């Protein structure tokens, strides 16, 4: 059976285009040629699809809220968990779920899962090289001691030669990095650097000390640590900190699979659709880690609502809850007096189009049997057949 024949059979089907394409590809891949068998598969797929559709008038938002909220009451309040790697902590459980729905700009424990391309993923040495290129290195991380020398009126840095070697750096590299960031005179005595300023004073030296410690030497900003872990037949990197844009530029990184738990960062770098998928994945993973199962369609409902305006918005008074069109709905959620005062001053009119506002005024809601109107001809006469 050819693709054209399948397309003709599926032409009038109620199945969505993506499902039609996947079904056609599966039938062709399995080499099914018997027409009766193909017809039966299409019929069964259509029946299964129709069974998954929502009944008209179903309160999908309420059901989604219940389905996520009820298992949420069983989630632990534990903030940290060892994610298979003893050295790294990530936020899980209820605190992580709150972070996701609040659309926090920065998670409490940002982390990345970095996959390597075919050339690097099977070789430990190459994976280690990529990790070194990613891990952020500053002056403090390659020094044994950084302190103010009161006698010589300078900042003294004692470099650790082993740390320099392991990170692929030399003393001249450190000197060059310091000079590019600060105007200082540097005296070099093997692994000891003396940094002098024009008008030395204890206050001036102490003010510069934290800046000297933080000078970036190598790697990706914000990536404090990178752990290498072998899973099945490939090496995967786990990072403490997140900077997906710069990590994508590192040689050896597979940009098609690498991800981060920072949803706002995904939105900024990869777009709103990627952020939507990340919300669904992160919520599902957080619930799954606690042994809880929630139908993905409930999670998709939340993700769609958060991303509907093209930017990730929190669910709460500072996001979706505070932007409802209805004044009464906004007032019923939080900050009741503030919303009612504001609406009164501006002369707003509530159209009573939603659920909450109709319940407040005692009208039937447009849900379930309330969303159906009975239409009848006014000229109908008793005894006359319709």
UniProtKB/Swiss-Prot annotation:
Q: Pfam families recorded for this chain?
A: RNA_pol_Rpb1_5
UniProt feature coiled coil, ranges: none
Localisation per UniProt entry: Cytoplasm
GO BP annotations of the record are: DNA-templated transcription
InterPro entries in the record:
DNA-dir_RpoC_beta_prime, RNA_pol_Rpb1_5, RPO1C
Per the record's keyword annotation, is Acetylation included, yes or no?
no
Entry-linked SUPFAM superfamilies: beta and beta-prime subunits of DNA dependent RNA-polymerase (SSF64484)
Record field: catalytic activity:
RNA(n) + a ribonucleoside 5'-triphosphate = RNA(n+1) + diphosphate
**Listed GO MF terms:** DNA binding; DNA-directed RNA polymerase activity
Return the EC number.
2.7.7.6
Keyword line: Cytoplasm, DNA-binding, DNA-directed RNA polymerase, Nucleotidyltransferase, Transcription, Transferase
**GO cellular component term of the entry, any:** DNA-directed RNA polymerase complex
Record function comment = DNA-dependent RNA polymerase (RNAP) catalyzes the transcription of DNA into RNA using the four ribonucleoside triphosphates as substrates. Forms part of the jaw domain.
Q: Matching HAMAP family, A to Z?
A: RNApol_arch_Rpo1C
Q: State how it assembles.
A: Part of the RNA polymerase complex.
Family statement drawn from the similarity comment of this UniProt entry? Belongs to the RNA polymerase beta' chain family.
Q: What is this protein called?
A: DNA-directed RNA polymerase subunit Rpo1C
- Please report the organism this UniProt entry assigns to the protein: Methanococcus maripaludis (strain C5 / ATCC BAA-1333)
């Amino acid at each position: 059976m050819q693709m054209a024949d399948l397309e003709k059979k599926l032409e009038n089907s109620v199945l969505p285009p993506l499902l039609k394409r996947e079904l056609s590809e599966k039938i062709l891949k399995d080499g099914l040629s018997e027409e009766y068998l193909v017809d039966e598969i299409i019929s069964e797929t259509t029946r299964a699809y129709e069974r998954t559709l929502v009944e008209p008038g179903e309160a999908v938002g309420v059901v989604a809220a219940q389905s996520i909220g009820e298992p949420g009451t069983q989630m632990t309040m534990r903030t940290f968990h060892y994610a298979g790697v003893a050295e790294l902590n990530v936020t899980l459980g209820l605190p992580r779920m709150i972070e996701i729905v609040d659309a926090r700009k920065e998670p409490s424990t940002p982390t990345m899962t970095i996959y390597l391309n075919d050339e690097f993923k099977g070789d430990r040495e190459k994976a280690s090289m990529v990790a070194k290129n990613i891990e952020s290195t500053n002056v403090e991380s390659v020094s044994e001691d950084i302190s103010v020398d009161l006698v010589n009126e300078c900042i003294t840095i004692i470099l650790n030669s082993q740390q320099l070697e392991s990170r692929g750096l030399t003393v001249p590299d450190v000197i060059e990095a310091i000079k590019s960031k600060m105007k200082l005179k540097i005296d070099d005595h093997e692994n000891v650097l003396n940094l002098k300023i024009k008008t030395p004073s204890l206050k001036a030296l102490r003010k510069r000390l934290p800046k000297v410690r933080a000078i970036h030497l190598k790697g990706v900003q914000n990536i404090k640590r990178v752990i290498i872990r072998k899973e099945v037949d490939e090496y995967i990197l786990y990072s403490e900190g997140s900077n997906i844009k710069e990590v994508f530029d590192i040689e050896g990184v597979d940009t098609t699979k690498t991800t981060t738990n920072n949803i706002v960062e995904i939105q900024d770098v990869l777009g709103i659709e990627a952020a939507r998928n990340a919300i669904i994945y992160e919520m599902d993973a957080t619930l799954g880690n606690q042994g809880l199962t929630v139908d993905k369609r409930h999670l998709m409902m939340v993700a769609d609502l958060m991303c509907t305006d093209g930017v990730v918005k929190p669910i709460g008074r500072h996001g979706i809850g505070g932007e409802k069109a209805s004044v009464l709905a906004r007032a019923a959620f939080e900050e009741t007096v503030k919303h009612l005062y504001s609406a009164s001053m501006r002369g707003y009119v509530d159209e009573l189009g939603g659920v909450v506002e109709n319940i407040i005024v005692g009208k039937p809601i447009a849900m379930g049997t309330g969303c159906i109107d009975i239409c009848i001809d006014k000229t109908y006469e008793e005894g006359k057949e319709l």
